């Protein structure tokens, strides 16, 4: 983690050419995605992105029909895709699998133009043959597969919950932004959370210090209580959440955001209750 933090600092302060992408994956989400994101990986790779919307439209229609049939689950298509993917051979390149076995933390760094040589020079000097870090230069196909694997990580947690719904209570998904100079990005959870946790999954946009954190909890866990503990921890750390999505009706809006919403909608007509604000007309809290 310390070397990756130094890498981020050096790229942002010293590089002339910034990365196109810098995607982080922890080993746990890598492994989960290898199994539970395989059908997503194969679908995108072999159907192509142009055909994916049509594929999901058909899948949605099938799920809609299944909801109307007694004793059949609307998750049947997803389950079928999951088990069908097991019939296919290993889909990830050998070198990437070896890298995952060797290291706990992974960064997919995509450079272009003169930035390629700049990154190679830096990595060769600071990362090559180091006992606590290393790198590989991906071939074109390997690079595409690595990024596609990162894409599939977004659905892997949900697929895990569906397959193991008898053991899983639910998933708490957080997207958080750490302070830009915060190098303490590896999370240490309290025992109160750990004893209820099946798996914690971490991935994100490393140069932005933005992380997606999915917590899969054991059956009968009070997820709202776990969420409250997690959010208090993030508040103490100075993190912001949600980082990439609006607060909606799930999170309390900060004071500046509340002021903005009140200015934008002074009569509280268009989305009353957003950011856990009151739902009264004109925000007065005294009349409907």
Language model features with spans:
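Conserved glycine-rich FAD pyrophosphate-binding loop
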Residues: 27, 35, 39, 60-67, ...
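Short, intrinsically disordered, mixed-charge
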Residues: 9-17, 232-236
């Amino acid at each position: 983690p310390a070397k990756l933090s130094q890498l981020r600092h050096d790229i942002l302060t010293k590089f002339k050419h910034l990365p196109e992408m810098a995607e982080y994956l922890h080993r746990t989400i890598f492994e989960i995605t290898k199994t539970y994101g395989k059908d997503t990986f194969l679908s995108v790779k072999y159907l192509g992105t142009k055909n994916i919307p049509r594929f999901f439209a058909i899948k949605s229609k099938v799920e809609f029909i299944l909801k109307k049939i007694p004793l059949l689950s609307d998750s049947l298509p997803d389950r079928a895709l999951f088990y069908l993917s097991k019939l296919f051979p290993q889909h990830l390149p050998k070198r990437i699998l070896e890298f995952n076995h060797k290291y706990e933390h992974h960064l997919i760094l995509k450079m272009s133009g003169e930035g390629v040589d700049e990154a190679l020079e830096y990595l060769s000097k600071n990362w090559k043959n180091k006992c606590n870090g290393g790198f590989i230069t991906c071939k074109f196909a390997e690079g595409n597969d690595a990024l596609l694997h990162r894409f599939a990580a977004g659905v892997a947690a949900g697929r895990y919950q569906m397959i193991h719904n008898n053991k899983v209570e639910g998933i708490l998904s957080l997207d958080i932004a750490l302070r830009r100079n915060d190098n303490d990005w590896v999370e240490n959870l309290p025992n109160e959370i750990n004893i209820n946790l099946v798996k914690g999954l971490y991935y994100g946009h490393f140069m932005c210090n933005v992380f997606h954190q999915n917590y899969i909890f054991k059956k009968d866990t009070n997820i709202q209580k776990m969420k409250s503990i997690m959010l208090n921890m993030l508040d103490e750390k100075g993190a912001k959440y949600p980082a990439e999505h609006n607060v909606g009706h799930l999170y309390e809006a900060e004071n500046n955001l509340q002021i903005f919403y009140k200015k934008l909608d002074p009569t509280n007509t268009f989305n009353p209750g957003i950011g856990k604000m009151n739902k009264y007309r004109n925000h007065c809290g005294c009349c409907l």
